[in-house]
């Protein structure tokens, strides 16, 4: 963002923190690859359960993948939140899109980079993969990403309805 060029001191501080954290992560990487114990440099947020399986800590390769992903996401978000001169609305909008993109690119979302999904596929003899592909094909055919099964909600049984009026409407929601 061009705002950083207008604030060279803040940019310098940001880059120094990045360089220091990068050096610490590189030392951690060398230690892990050498088979030595090394505490994680970047910890997931307490409510982030994506890396809660012990394999993400106990196996060096998976641990490093987790560490590099968390390092990258943490620094991208820090840079965004510290960007000088951004209007609050612009900052929130950018944070929303960056957070969604970073979450979408998490190693936990891809079979090749998710040891938990790989283990599940082996345990289930591929049934989890087959079911996932079926859901994907259903979503492609429906031209939407469904979060529930189409028949999950029935008016009067699992879905309540009452007469009402819209009391609040904005870009994200309607409150009735």
Spans of features found by a protein language model:
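Amphipathic, low-complexity, repeat-rich surface-exposed segments
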Residues: 1-173
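Conserved beta-strand in the GNAT
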Residues: 176
């Amino acid at each position: 963002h061009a705002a950083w060029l207008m604030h060279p001191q803040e940019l310098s501080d940001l880059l120094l923190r990045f360089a220091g954290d990068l050096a610490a992560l590189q030392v951690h990487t060398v230690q892990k690859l050498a088979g030595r114990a090394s505490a994680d440099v970047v910890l997931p947020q307490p409510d982030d359960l994506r890396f809660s399986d012990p394999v993400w800590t106990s196996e060096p390769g998976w641990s490093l993948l987790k560490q590099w992903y968390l390092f990258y996401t943490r620094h991208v978000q820090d840079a965004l939140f510290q960007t000088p001169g951004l209007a609050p609305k612009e900052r929130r909008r950018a944070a929303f899109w960056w957070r969604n993109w970073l979450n979408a690119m998490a190693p936990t979302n891809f079979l090749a980079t998710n040891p938990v999904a790989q283990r599940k596929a082996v345990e289930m003899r591929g049934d989890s993969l087959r079911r996932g592909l079926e859901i994907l094909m259903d979503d492609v055919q429906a031209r939407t990403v469904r979060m529930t099964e189409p028949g999950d909600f029935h008016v009067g049984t699992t879905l309540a309805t009452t007469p009402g009026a819209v009391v609040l409407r904005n870009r994200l929601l309607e409150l009735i």
